[in-house]
Amino acid sequence: PIHDQAGKNLDNLADAVYKVLEELAISEYILCAHSLSGILACKLLKKPIKCQALVAIEPTTKNVMFADFSENPYPEMEEQMRLIEECGPELYFKNLTQETFSPETNKEIWKIMQEKRSELENQDSGFQISGEITEEDFENVSIESHVPVFIFCQAYREKEYRESEYWTSNTKLILGGNHHYLQWSESEKIATIILELSE
């Protein structure tokens, strides 16, 4: 079930994930993170259990999270946001999943989405679907250079990541795709890297 995240922050979430790893007696793992969970991944990397590598899919950077786009325009991102606003989030995502998945998989995805939506609709008012994320969450965030980092991102975000908290001497960028959900369109490339790291 979905739990209320009111009063929770990223440190609480990192502690909860770490507790699960401990309870499962995981001694090392490959961490795969998308979007906002990228900053959560950075916090998990500080924990004692060894992370073999971070595979980050368009992880959120401080520069974008707290950017003033009126002063620093990001045309490609603005265009994607315009599309979402124009057709609505649900239609935008339906178009993306239809382009990416087989009809059977697409149907299953939207069945699960509907179940989660129904679960959310039955919650009390004031229910929070995600924890608070503040600028402080990005303070003192860095990744040790011994951890290999693979960042999947759209080509226009290359400079952003090279200047970000995810960049080390051991970071590799894999450019591709034309939307934020690269785990869908670039899944084979992502799986290949994870399999190679697992060997």
Residue ranges and their predicted role:
Residues 178-187:
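Catalytic histidine-centered segment of alpha/beta-hydrolase-like enzymes
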Residues 75-111:
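Accessory cap/linker subdomain of secreted extracellular hydrolases
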Residues 1-30:
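Active-site loop/oxyanion-hole signature of alpha/beta-hydrolase fold enzymes
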Residues 102-177:
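Conserved serine/cysteine hydrolase catalytic core
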